[in-house]
UniProtKB/Swiss-Prot annotation:
Its main location: cytoplasm. This is Lon protease. PROSITE patterns: LON_N, LON_PROTEOLYTIC, LON_SER. It comes from Citrifermentans bemidjiense (strain ATCC BAA-1014 / DSM 16622 / JCM 12645 / Bem). Residues 774-794 are annotated as: Disordered.
Length: 794
């Protein structure tokens, strides 16, 4: 059937291009226009109040026609109301679809030539079914809250025309403007009805999902409101019964802790702000636990809690001597601190760094200092630490965040002035998580640590009352800025006499007690302890000495448990019987004087040691072979020594031609142990001169010193450890740089009496003292000796 519409449509009609809306037939709508858009509607009076509304495809850049869609709507101007500010409100009614044929005039008013679009809608079972389904679906959509005006609702119930129904329903679908234009351009009413039905089906599905979500939300909100009401009722009941809300009680408890924590004023303000925030948080929320834990830390940290110092210097000295033998420098420094503290109440805590080989008592000394001062003792190991957060903590935004180890340990100690030991500071690592050594810069700087800010606490904490003690085996790995902040105290290795006293005073009694021999305590003779020290240990400290004494005690305990009689005395024979064959021997004493082999002294983080530099030559092209895992510095020392020898062949009694046809090989056993450092320079030169001159190097002479290219002997470090190593190895004479003569003060008198010291300024003096004069000796320069020094060998 054909939709019959009687309208007197002129051949030419004014045109208004649409941008934001689509006009459908039978649609009554209002648009608001600016003054410059009014001409087409004012001109419509001349064209039976008709105007064509056609949507723009795109903004016109020249001619208007190509920018317009082909299908639009012919509308009737119902009313024009002028607005006070300019422009007008225009009421329009859609009449029919029209096809744009041409633009006959573009300015000042666009005039268009149109033709009506005839719509044919034959009544059929399909169209009737679609109309019925669309009406039913529309009512379902309306049940989800999509309201339509009452007059429209009444109209829909009586419309059975597919063309009119599809246009009317399309107006109220929430479709994009391009989809509406496609519906307008669908001329076949049945096809248009199918599209509208499809869009309405999607809209109903969307409304169903939205309704389900809203129902779920409403259910949850209702449950929350119900819980809230029940809690309020429970609170009222508790108040009537005189009981207190658990949450309120928890908040009151925290508030009283904040008030009694004696926090600094700025920290107190932050704590009170966090308290107010906590009171507003639901206890079931994860944020509640985070806030509660933070407040617990703030209120338990010892902001003003200090341990009173023991200022009795005599008593402090007694305690230090009870716990440790010797270590005069450290004890003197602690007593100095106590003396100043007794004169000045408020002072910054010292930051000490104990450097020395393992087993010399660095860590146990920290405990002794804490006992001396009457303070709490804290120790954390920094060895292998790579995460900066271990020092500074994590920010509270991270799950499971906690303060750093500094704040945690001070909080655990319950005092703001403990003795805090940072062990193994030379073994800190660094990776992508940061550098803990850099984080320690603030902790160990007396000028900054009064306001140390942990990332978790996010408030400053005063560390100036803390006595920080760090320990290290060597200084080189410690970053220079960190080293600069610490007062370095070097702990040297022990002499045999010191080890004997330590064993008698501390180690034997401790191991006898720990191994259940207190009632039958065996007596260790001095000779037995010396046998253990000399034949079963080779160390700077006393750790292995303690292990061997413990081993002897365990073996005696085993004999007692087997029914044997306890040994009342432990003598050297007992030691050999229980510990087996000796593990160490006097390396030098067992050697012979050899050509090309010189004895040097080295320093390691485990103490002093002796090294043998071996030189040999082979016929061949001039070359230098270096083996023994030598570092770059040591290799350069060899080259410098070789260059000196070549340059002074005549003076040293060596044929220079020998170098032209000789391959020189330098080796330092043991080959698997890396070695480096400059102090073996004179040893290298002595081995080379011994080899090419044929003069054997004395086995009982050990040397240490860096050599320059001109033969000057330069100062070295670690002389005490090297001298003790020489003594352990059976060396009789030690050659050292003249500039190290001052270091003799650190060497015990009994050691100085056992060894002969010869201090040299020039390498030629070394050759005189270290090489046997089996061939013409080189000219010697004047030597610097100790007063007790022996004359050079004859």
């Amino acid at each position: 059937m054909t939709e019959n519409i009687t309208i007197n449509m002129p051949e030419i009609v004014p045109l208004y291009p649409l941008r934001e809306i689509i006009a459908f037939p039978y649609m009554v709508f209002t648009i608001f226009l600016k003054q410059e858009d009014m001409p087409p509607f004012e001109e419509a009076v001349l064209f039976n109040n008709l105007v064509a509304l056609v949507k723009l495809r795109e903004e016109p850049t020249g001619e208007l026609f190509p920018a317009l869609h082909e299908i639009g709507t012919l509308c009737k101007v119902m009313q024009i109301n002028k607005l006070a500010g300019g422009g007008a409100k225009v009421v329009l009614e859609g009449v029919i679809r029209v096809r744009l044929l041409a633009i006959v005039q573009q300015t000042p008013v666009a005039l268009s030539r149109l033709e009506p679009v005839r719509e044919f809608a034959e009544k059929s079972m399909v169209s009737e079914a679609l109309v019925g389904s669309l009406n039913a679906l529309l009512k379902i959509a309306l049940s989800y809250g999509r309201p339509l005006p009452d007059d429209v609702m009444k109209m829909i119930d009586f419309i059975d025309n597919p063309a009119r129904l599809s246009d009317l329903v399309a107006l109220y679908l929430n479709l994009p403007i391009d989809e509406l234009q496609k519906l307008l351009e669908t001329v076949d009413p049945l096809e248009r009805l199918k599209k509208v039905y499809m869009h309405l089906t999607n809209e109903v599905q969307r409304l169903q999902i939205k309704g389900e979500v809203q129902a779920e939300v409403t259910k949850k909100v209702g449950k929350s409101q119900k819980e809230f009401l029940l809690r309020e009722q429970m609170k009222q009941i508790q108040e009537e019964l005189g009981e207190e809300d658990s949450r309120l009680g928890e908040a009151n408890e925290l508030r009283s802790k904040v008030e009694s924590a004696h926090m600094p004023e700025d920290v107190r303000r932050i704590a009170e702000k966090e308290m107010r925030r906590l009171e507003r948080i639901n206890p079931a929320s994860p944020e509640y636990t985070v806030s509660r834990t933070y407040l617990d830390y703030l209120t338990t940290i010892p902001w003003q809690v200090s341990t009173p110092d023991n200022r009795d210097i005599n008593q402090a000295e007694t305690i230090l001597n009870e716990d440790h033998y010797d270590l005069k420098k450290v004890k003197e420094r602690i007593l100095e601190y106590l003396a100043v503290r007794s004169l000045k109440d408020k002072m910054k805590g010292p930051i000490l760094c104990f450097v020395g080989p393992p087993g010399v008592g660095k860590t146990s000394l920290g405990k002794s200092i804490a006992r001396t001062l009457g303070r709490k003792f804290i120790r954390i190991s920094l060895g292998g630490m790579r995460d900066e957060a271990e020092i500074r903590g994590h920010r509270r935004t991270y799950i499971g965040a906690l303060p750093g180890r500094i704040i945690q340990e001070i909080n655990r100690a319950g005092s703001n002035n403990p003795v805090f030991m940072l062990d193994e500071v030379d073994k800190i690592g660094a990776d992508f998580r940061g550098d803990p050594a850099s984080a320690l810069l603030e902790v160990l700087d007396p000028e900054q640590n009064f306001s140390f800010t942990d990332h978790y606490l996010d408030v400053p904490f005063d560390l100036t009352n803390v006595m920080f003690i760090t320990t290290a085996n060597q200084l080189d790995p410690i970053p220079a800025p960190l080293k600069d902040r610490m007062e370095v105290i070097t702990l040297s290795g022990y002499t045999d006499e010191e080890k004997l006293n330590i064993a008698k005073s501390y180690l034997v009694a401790r191991e006898v007690e720990e191994n259940g021999l207190a009632s039958m305590a065996p007596q260790f003779t001095d000779e037995a302890i010396y046998r253990v020290t000399h034949d079963y240990t080779r160390e700077a400290g006393v750790r292995n000495l303690q292990r061997n004494i413990a081993s002897i005690c365990r073996k005696i305990a085993k004999e007692v448990a087997q029914g044997k009689k306890a040994r009342p005395i432990v003598n050297p024979e007992t030691v050999s019987e229980l510990l087996g064959a000796p593990k160490f021997f006097d390396e030098v004493a067992s050697e012979k004087d050899r050509v090309g082999v010189a004895t040097g002294l080295a320093w390691t983080e485990s103490g002093g040691d002796i090294i043998f530099v071996e030189a040999t030559k082979m016929k061949g092209k001039e070359d230098l072979i270096l083996t023994g895992s030598l570092g770059e510095v040591m290799k350069e020392s060899v080259r410098a020594a070789l260059s000196f020898v070549k340059a002074n062949c005549a003076e040293l009694g060596i044929d220079k031609k020998m170098f032209d046809e000789t391959t020189l090989h330098i080796h330092v056993p043991a080959g698997s142990i890396p070695k480096d450092g400059p102090s073996a320079g004179i040893t290298m030169a002595t081995a080379i001169v011994s080899l090419f001159s044929g003069r054997a190097a004395r086995r009982d002479v050990a040397m240490t010193g860096e050599m320059s290219l001109t033969g000057r002997v330069l100062a070295i470090g670690g002389l005490k450890e090297k001298v003790l190593a020489a003594r352990r190895a059976g060396v009789k004479k030690v050659l050292a740089p003249a500039k190290n003569k001052k270091d003799l003060e650190d060497i015990p008198e009994n050691v100085k009496n056992e060894l002969e010291f010869f201090f040299v300024e020039d390498i030629r003096e070394v050759f005189v003292q270290a090489l046997n004069p089996t061939s013409p000796a080189p000219t010697a320069a004047t030597s610097a000796r100790t007063p007790a020094g022996a004359p050079p060998p004859q």
